[in-house]
Structure formats: structure tokens, C-alpha cells
A protein has these predicted regions:
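Residues at secondary-structure transition points
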Residues: 8, 12, 55-59, 63
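Conserved hydrophobic/aromatic packing and binding residues within compact polymer-binding modules
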Residues: 17, 31-32, 42-45
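The alpha-helix within a helix-turn-helix
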Residues: 21, 32, 69
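Recognition helix of helix-turn-helix/homeodomain-like DNA-binding domains
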Residues: 36-60
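DNA major-groove recognition helix of helix-turn-helix/homeodomain DNA-binding modules
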Residues: 59-77
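Helix-turn-helix/homeodomain-like alpha-helical modules used for DNA recognition
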Residues: 82-85
Length: 85
């Protein structure tokens, strides 16, 4: 089952991502790589601490991603699979 949570600010995003990171075995912290902005979709890749950086992606801090999303007039939803069926 998919769970969607509307993200209002950076603090809430960090909290939700930490829950997600911990459930996948990552340590606290991490980076977000903004990959693409398209209509209704902003794609980004989340990496744990010390990600391999091949120099081809630009790293954005979470607050920068939030600012970009709000500037473009989007709402941000974090969608994740819920293991409970």
C-alpha cells in the first residue's frame, strides 16, 4: 500500500526522510540529488552518508529543493510503500 504525505517545510521533509532512511538501513543524514524537473514531477535520488559521487549530478541541500518546489508553485508529497498490507 502506498502512503503519501504532503511536505510543508524542510523540518517535516527531514523527519520523513529519516524515517525512510532508517527503515532501509541507512545511517542518519544523507544527500538529495535533484535529477529532473518536469510538469507535476520533480525527480531526485536520495543517498546515505558518504555517497559515491561520479561528478555528473548536482547536489542540492534539502532546503534548496524545498525552495525550488515552492518557487515553481508545486506541492511536495513524499510517497513510500507501506509494508503493512
Amino acid at each position: 500500500m502506498r502512503k503519501a504525505t504532503e511536505i510543508i517545510d524542510e523540518r517535516q521533509l527531514v523527519s520523513e526522510l529519516h524515517i525512510n532512511w532508517k527503515s532501509r538501513g541507512y545511517t542518519d543524514g544523507g544527500m538529495a540529488d535533484l535529477l529532473e524537473i518536469a510538469p507535476k514531477t520533480i525527480s531526485y535520488k536520495l543517498s546515505g552518508i558518504n555517497p559515491d559521487n561520479n561528478g555528473k549530478k548536482t547536489h542540492f541541500k534539502l532546503n534548496e529543493i524545498i525552495q525550488i518546489i515552492h518557487y515553481l508553485g508545486f506541492k511536495l508529497y513524499l510517497v513510500r510503500e507501506d509494508d503493512a498490507k
